[in-house]
C-alpha cells in the first residue's frame, strides 16, 4: 500500500528571472547566444580566471605546512585584513582606528543573508528595504524571507540613457526614515563627488542604513582604488553601514564563493559588539567558511609580485571590455542604426544597458535566439570577435522593425 508523502502539500517554487538561462539551455538553435552571464567571459567564451590564481592555487596545494582544520567562526583573519585593506586602502584611518571589520562569508548571498539576519533582530522597527532593480533577484528574496517589505528602485534613466543622480535623490526623499537601502555597483555609477555628497547628506538626515555591494572591485575602471573611492569617502565621514565585498569575480574563483561582510561602525566598541552578534548567526548558518579560495586571495594580496600580476590581469579585462564596447558602438553606427549609442561606452563595468525597449528585447530573444534580460542590461564580456557581427546586426534589425 502506498503511503502519503509528507511533502504532498509542497508546490513548485515560483519561477525567477533566472529561468532565462533555463530557456536558453532548452533552445535547440545552434547559434543561440546568452548575454546575461554573471561571470567575466574570455574571448573564447569561457569563464575568465586570472592566471596568477592558477599559479597560486598550485603553490597552496603543494604546501605541506597547511592543515585542513576548521577555520574560526569569523573566518580566515589574514584574509579579512587583506580584504579590508584592498577595499579602504592600507593607510585607511578607519582601519587604524579599528572601526571597520568583517566576517568571512560564503558567497555574496551569504553577506546579505548574514546582514539581513542581524538587521531583522536589531532594527526591529525597520520593515522597508529598497533594492536596485538589477539586484532584486539576487538579494530581494533573502530580505523577503526575513519579513522585510522589499521595494525596487532604478537609477537608470531610459530616456537619457544614463545613470541619473536625480532619480536616486527622489528615491531617498520618498522612502521612510530609517529604511535599509541596498546600494549596488557603486563602481558603475558615474556620479560626481558633489552628487555623492548630496546623496550622503540625505542618507544621514533620514537615518537610512546603507548596505553596499562591491561585487567586482577593479573591473569597472581597472583601478582598484578608483573603484571604491566613494566608499572610502563615506567611511571617512563616519557613516555606519554594511557592505558585501565579493572577491569571486575579480579573481575568477566563482565556485569558491569568497568574500566578507564588512561592518563600518562609529567606534571599535560598537564594531566588536556587532561582530560578536554576527558570529552567533554564523554558527547557526554555516559554521565554517571555505578556506581554499580565501587562502589563494590572501597569498596574492600579501605578495607584491603576485599582487602586481593580478592588477595587470584586471586592467587587461577592462581594456578588452572597453574595446568591445567601442566596436559595438561603431558597428551600429556603420549599420546606420537609428539613435545614439554613445551610452554604451559611457558606462563602466562588465555589465551595462543597451537601451533597448521590451519589444526590441523580445525580438532578439524570440527571433534571433539572443538571450538578455527585459531591461537590456547585458554582460559585455559575452561579446567577442565570433559573435559581435551577429549581435550588432540583430540589434539593428530589432530597432528598425520597431522604429516608429
Curated annotation (Swiss-Prot):
Location(s) in or outside the cell: Cytoplasm
GO cellular component, one term: cytoplasm
Residues carrying N6-(pyridoxal phosphate)lysine: 249
Keyword Transferase: yes
GO MF: L-aspartate:2-oxoglutarate aminotransferase activity; pyridoxal phosphate binding
Cofactor(s) this protein cannot do without: pyridoxal 5'-phosphate
Superkingdom per UniProt: Eukaryota
Gene3D superfamilies per UniProt: Aspartate Aminotransferase, domain 1, Type I PLP-dependent aspartate aminotransferase-like (Major domain)
Family: Belongs to the class-I pyridoxal-phosphate-dependent aminotransferase family.
Subunit structure: Homodimer.
The name this protein goes by in its record: Putative aspartate aminotransferase, cytoplasmic 2
Lineage: Eukaryota, Metazoa, Chordata, Craniata, Vertebrata
Amino acid at each position: 500500500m502506498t503511503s502519503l508523502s509528507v511533502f504532498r502539500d509542497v508546490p513548485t517554487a515560483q519561477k525567477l528571472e533566472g529561468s532565462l538561462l533555463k530557456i536558453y539551455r532548452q533552445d535547440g538553435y545552434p547559434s543561440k547566444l546568452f548575454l546575461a552571464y554573471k561571470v567575466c567571459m574570455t574571448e573564447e567564451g569561457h569563464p575568465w580566471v586570472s592566471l596568477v590564481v592558477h599559479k597560486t592555487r598550485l603553490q597552496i596545494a603543494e604546501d605541506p605546512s597547511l592543515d585542513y582544520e576548521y577555520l574560526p567562526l569569523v573566518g580566515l583573519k589574514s584574509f579579512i585584513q587583506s580584504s579590508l585593506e584592498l577595499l579602504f586602502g592600507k593607510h585607511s584611518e578607519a582601519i587604524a582606528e579599528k572601526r571597520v571589520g568583517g566576517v568571512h562569508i560564503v558567497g555574496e548571498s551569504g553577506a546579505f543573508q548574514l546582514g539581513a539576519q542581524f538587521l531583522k533582530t536589531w532594527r526591529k522597527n525597520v520593515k522597508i528595504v529598497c533594492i536596485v532593480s538589477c539586484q532584486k533577484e539576487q538579494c530581494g528574496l533573502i530580505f523577503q524571507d526575513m519579513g522585510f517589505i522589499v521595494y525596487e528602485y532604478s537609477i537608470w534613466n531610459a530616456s537619457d540613457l544614463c545613470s541619473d543622480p536625480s532619480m536616486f535623490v527622489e528615491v531617498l526623499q520618498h522612502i521612510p526614515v530609517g529604511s535599509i537601502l541596498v546600494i549596488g555597483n557603486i563602481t558603475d555609477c558615474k556620479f560626481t563627488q558633489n552628487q555623492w555628497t548630496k546623496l550622503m547628506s540625505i542618507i544621514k538626515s533620514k537615518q537610512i542604513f546603507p548596505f553596499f555591494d562591491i561585487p567586482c572591485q577593479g573591473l569597472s575602471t581597472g583601478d582598484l582604488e578608483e573603484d571604491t573611492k566613494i566608499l572610502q569617502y563615506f567611511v571617512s565621514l563616519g557613516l555606519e553601514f554594511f557592505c558585501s565585498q565579493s572577491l569571486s569575480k575579480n579573481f575568477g574563483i566563482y565556485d569558491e564563493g569568497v568574500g566578507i561582510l564588512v561592518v563600518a561602525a562609529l567606534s571599535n566598541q560598537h564594531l566588536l559588539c556587532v561582530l560578536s552578534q554576527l558570529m552567533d548567526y554564523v554558527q547557526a548558518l554555516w559554521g565554517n567558511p571555505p578556506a581554499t579560495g580565501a587562502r589563494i586571495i590572501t597569498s596574492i594580496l600579501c605578495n607584491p609580485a603576485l599582487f602586481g600580476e593580478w592588477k595587470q590581469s584586471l586592467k587587461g579585462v577592462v581594456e578588452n571590455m572597453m574595446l568591445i564596447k567601442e566596436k559595438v558602438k561603431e558597428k551600429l553606427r556603420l549599420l546606420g542604426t537609428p539613435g545614439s549609442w554613445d551610452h554604451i561606452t559611457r558606462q563602466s563595468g562588465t555589465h551595462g544597458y543597451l537601451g533597448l525597449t521590451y519589444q526590441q528585447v523580445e525580438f532578439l530573444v524570440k527571433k534571433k535566439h539572443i538571450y538578455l534580460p527585459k531591461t537590456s542590461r547585458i554582460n559585455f564580456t559575452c561579446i567577442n570577435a565570433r559573435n559581435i557581427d551577429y549581435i550588432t546586426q540583430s540589434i539593428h534589425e530589432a530597432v528598425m522593425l520597431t522604429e516608429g
